[in-house]
């Protein structure tokens, strides 16, 4: 259902996903353009109203990502595609250019309004900030009809000055005014009062949607947002799995399911009868779990087991009393059905006799759109897996597809061969062959404290890019001794963190490929920093 303006016609809560912009600011969560496009497509299937695709002026990579998402996802039936821009002409021009292919483009511009930011960061007076905000919103409006304005650090801004800024930018053409709790400082009561104050003291607020953006430094982001909805906010800026810098952002899945499960409580705040069963958001909740796994795999950020809604233990019961109750009637200890978020028992869908068309069809049904090259590689992986595993599940297919969509960087380093030798009375030794970006094949060997350490040492002898391994984790995709193992690693180089992910029934091979994927991201990062030192 398309957003309608003026905003008083907005009779539901709009979901503004900023996974690709604010979420990517998590250390090590950097994504390449193809990965961003994959996530954007899934966000569209999920039903988000607005996708903040990036910060076009920040780097050529961000510009390209926003432009490609605008072209492929920003269709007439797709979501609004948004680009972030500081309150400067060059930022706004870059955003407008990147967003041009989108059917529904939005420019999101911002400037700080708290006295501490004005004094120490901007070194400007309130009058100067007021003029800049009004002028830049009007400038953005000259490119697109849909303009969002954020007064950065609104939670610590003087309310009277905040009201004045918001009134001016709405007069200048802002269709959405976003209230950020930039440092995650406010409590629900304070945040609700802030939104209520804006609703009551900004004379033209009925001409704009009130949006909220918050960080989770005190673990209050979701609670703050729900209080904001009760006081008039109609757009929530959030990320999948709550990823983001520091403690992260408000988690989309928690907000959406809170509004779904407790809709009878929230209905009156949106002018609906309490008994209304109509959803409060446009989200297809059955796509939540799939989207969560996709973002986790591509960013390399694991989901804590006890994470609400999408954690591995979210629907698990250890207590015997709880287990007995759930077996008799799920609602004794579960407030929602796991199937609501797309978490269902996976059926055996394919076997070793299945053909390429059946494989491709099932991947499309699972939401994956692979290129011909990716599909060919994925099918070979599937046939190889089918020879090793008796049962193939959807989780197995997802692991293969995500591995291929993350992709091997054909212009970077490629792992051609890996072999290890180890045992309880042998020193772990690894031999690897790596193809360099110039096409040269190099082979080397190393001894380590274990087989994975030996592989990494051997790869390092070939690649010779200084780095420090700061995280290594293995997760089983399915049950059974023949399960695919997913390996996620994070490397640090100077002040940057890079992640890599791979899946294989052989954990050593998965570990080696995950390491190569991370090294290629590091390699590309070094190239970009050399070409664009300020990016």
From Swiss-Prot:
Q: List its EC numbers.
A: 2.3.3.13
* Molecular functions (GO terms): 2-isopropylmalate synthase activity; acetyl-CoA C-acetyltransferase activity; manganese ion binding
Q: Which residues form the Pyruvate carboxyltransferase domain?
A: 13-274
Q: Which cofactor does it need?
A: Mn(2+)
Compartments (UniProt record): Cytoplasm
Q: Does the keyword ATP-binding apply?
A: no
Class of enzymatic activity (EC top level)? transferase
Q: Which GO terms describe its cellular component?
A: cytoplasm
Report the Pfam families cross-referenced here.
Answer: HCS_D2, HMGL-like, LeuA_dimer
InterPro entries associated with the record: 2-IPM_HCS-like (IPR050073), 2-isopropylmalate_synth_dimer (IPR013709), AIPM/Hcit_synth_CS (IPR002034), Aldolase_TIM (IPR013785), LeuA/HCS_post-cat (IPR054691), LeuA_allosteric_dom_sf (IPR036230), LeuA_bact_synth (IPR005671), PYR_CT (IPR000891)
What job does the chain carry out? Catalyzes the condensation of the acetyl group of acetyl-CoA with 3-methyl-2-oxobutanoate (2-ketoisovalerate) to form 3-carboxy-3-hydroxy-4-methylpentanoate (2-isopropylmalate).
Q: How does it assemble?
A: Homodimer.
Query: What family is this?
Result: Belongs to the alpha-IPM synthase/homocitrate synthase family. LeuA type 1 subfamily.
Fetch the PANTHER family from UniProt. 2-ISOPROPYLMALATE SYNTHASE 1, CHLOROPLASTIC-RELATED, HOMOCITRATE SYNTHASE-RELATED
Could you identify this protein by its name?
Answer: 2-isopropylmalate synthase
Protein source organism: Thermosynechococcus vestitus (strain NIES-2133 / IAM M-273 / BP-1)
Q: What does UniProt list as this organism's lineage?
A: Bacteria, Bacillati, Cyanobacteriota, Cyanophyceae, Acaryochloridales
């Amino acid at each position: 259902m398309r957003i309608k303006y003026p905003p008083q016609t907005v009779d539901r809560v709009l979901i503004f996903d900023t996974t690709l912009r604010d979420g990517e600011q998590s250390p090590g969560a950097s994504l390449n353009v193809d990965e961003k496009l994959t996530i954007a497509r899934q966000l569209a299937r999920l039903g988000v109203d607005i996708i903040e695709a990036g910060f076009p002026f920040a780097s050529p990579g961000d510009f390209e990502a926003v432009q490609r998402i605008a072209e492929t996802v920003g269709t007439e039936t797709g979501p609004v595609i948004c680009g972030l821009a500081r309150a400067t002409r060059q930022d706004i021009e870059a955003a407008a250019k990147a967003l041009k292919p989108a059917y529904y483009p939005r420019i999101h511009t911002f400037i700080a309004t708290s006295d501490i930011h004005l004094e120490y960061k901007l070194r400007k007076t309130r009058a100067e900030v007021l003029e800049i905000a009004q002028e830049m919103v009007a400038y953005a409006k000259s490119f697109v009809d849909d303009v969002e304005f954020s007064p950065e650090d609104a939670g610590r801004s003087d309310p009277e000055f905040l009201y004045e800024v918001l009134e001016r930018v709405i007069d200048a053409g802002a269709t959405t005014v976003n209230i950020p709790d930039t440092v995650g400082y406010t409590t629900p009561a304070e945040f609700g009062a802030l939104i209520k104050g804006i609703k009551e003291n900004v004379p033209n607020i009925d001409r704009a949607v009130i949006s909220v953006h918050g960080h989770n430094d005190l673990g209050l982001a979701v609670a703050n947002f729900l209080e904001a909805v009760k006081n008039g906010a109609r757009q929530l800026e959030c990320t999948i799995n709550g990823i983001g810098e520091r403690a992260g952002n408000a988690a989309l899945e928690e907000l959406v399911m809170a509004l779904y499960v407790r809709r009878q409580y929230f209905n009156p705040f949106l002018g609906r009868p309490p008994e209304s069963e109509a959803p409060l958001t446009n989200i297809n909740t059955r796509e939540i779990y799939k989207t969560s796994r996709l973002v986790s795999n591509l960013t390399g950020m694991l989901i804590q087991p006890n994470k609400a809604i999408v954690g591995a233990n979210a629907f698990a019961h250890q207590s015997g009393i709880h287990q007995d109750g759930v077996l008799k009637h799920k609602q004794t200890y579960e407030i929602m059905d796991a199937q609501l978020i797309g978490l269902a028992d996976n059926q055996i869908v394919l076997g070793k006799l299945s053909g390429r068309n059946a494989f491709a069809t099932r991947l499309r049904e699972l939401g994956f759109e692979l290129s011909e090259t990716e599909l060919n590689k994925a099918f070979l992986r599937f046939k190889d897996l089918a020879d090793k595993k008796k049962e193939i599940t959807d989780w197995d297919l997802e692991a293969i597809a995500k591995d291929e969509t993350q992709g091997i960087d054909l212009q970077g380093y490629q792992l051609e061969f890996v072999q290890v030798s180890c045992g309880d009375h042998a020193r772990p030794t690894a031999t690897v062959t790596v193809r360099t970006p110039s096409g040269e094949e190099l082979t080397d060997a190393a001894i380590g404290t274990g087989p994975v350490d030996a592989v990494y040492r051997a790869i390092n002898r070939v690649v010779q890019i200084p780095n420090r391994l700061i995280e290594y984790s293995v997760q089983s995709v399915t049950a059974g001794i023949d399960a695919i193992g997913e390996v996620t690693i994070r490397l640090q180089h100077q002040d940057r963190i890079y992640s890599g992910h791979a899946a294989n029934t052989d954990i050593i091979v998965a570990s080696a490929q995950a390491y190569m994927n991370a090294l290629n991201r590091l390699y590309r990062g070094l190239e970009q920093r050399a070409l664009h030192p300020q990016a």
